[in-house]
Amino acid sequence: MKILVVGGTRFFGIPMVKKLIADGHEVTLATRGQHTDRFGSSVQRITLDKTDESSVKAALCGKSFDVIIDKVAYSSNDVRSLLKHALCEKYIQMSSCAVYQSEHLNITENEFDQKSIELKWLDRPADYALGKRLAERAALEFMDEKNCVFVRFPVVLGENDYTGRLAFYAQHICGGLPMHIQNINAKTSYIHETQAGEFIAKLVDTDISGAVNGCSDGIVSQRDIIGYIEKKCGKQAIISQSGDNAPYDDVCSDKSYDCTKAKSLGFAFSDISSYLYSLLDNEIKQV
């Protein structure tokens, strides 16, 4: 199949594109061209700026694909600039579990219905969750829902994570730096970059539509992360109101996501314990 990947040269886009290539698809990467990818002659490349509709039009107008995988849908205008000018049979949007407005265990896909919200055409708002909700809603202005997939992941972890969020805990605990944490005991879900990327690639060849959750089995708290680092580096975490805000502190109560729909495709998610602590070991070594 002819597949356009918008974004995808870093983090979990790497295993995603690798899997698409391995499965024999004809892959075109559309990026701003700011980062060198590692795919060589296995892919074609288009340069565009998703936030500039004229750039998107110049790069994609008149082009058609079997599938578009949109990894940079942060607002309704992001989606409009793309789907207004590129044609596809199937649209897979990298959404987020941030679209859900309640926190509890086993959150299901139907707890956020993009059709239920008012569409507003906005550039990328400061409110990340709002932008993601509107991005889902905007897609339905251009595509039938049966031809759309909205992939909802929690925080993605992995060796290629460039955000520095997991490193924050190792750096602060091992370095004796204070952290500000309010919700230390609340547990939540994560997913590893390899499974995140390979799951999206798998969706290309399925008939699934609508929203789909994807996350590792098991949930962990900041206390779990901190306790492991404390034991490994032999230092106690300094928790202080004047400390730096911890990146995973936005979870107020235990929450997880029901992945029955994803698992019905035969995709198996690993347990978070199979990779979290090795990632923490790596972060500790780098301090």
Region annotations inferred by a language model:
Residues 3-23:
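N-terminal Rossmann NAD(P)H-binding glycine-rich loop of SDR-like oxidoreductase domains
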Residues 34-93, 99:
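NAD(P)H-binding glycine-rich loop region in Rossmannoid oxidoreductase-like domains
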Residues 95, 136-159:
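Conserved beta-loop-beta element that borders a ligand/cofactor-binding pocket
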Residues 97-126, 137, 141-144:
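Active-site "gating" loop of Rossmann-like NAD(P)-dependent oxidoreductase/epimerase domains
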Residues 125, 154-163, 183-194:
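Glycine-rich "substrate-gating" loop/helix at the edge of Rossmann-like oxidoreductase active sites
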Residues 170-180, 185-216:
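Alpha-helical substrate-binding/gating segment
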Residues 199-253:
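Mid/C-terminal beta-alpha module of Rossmann-like enzyme folds, strongest
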Residues 252-287:
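C-terminal amphipathic/interface module of NAD(P)-dependent oxidoreductases
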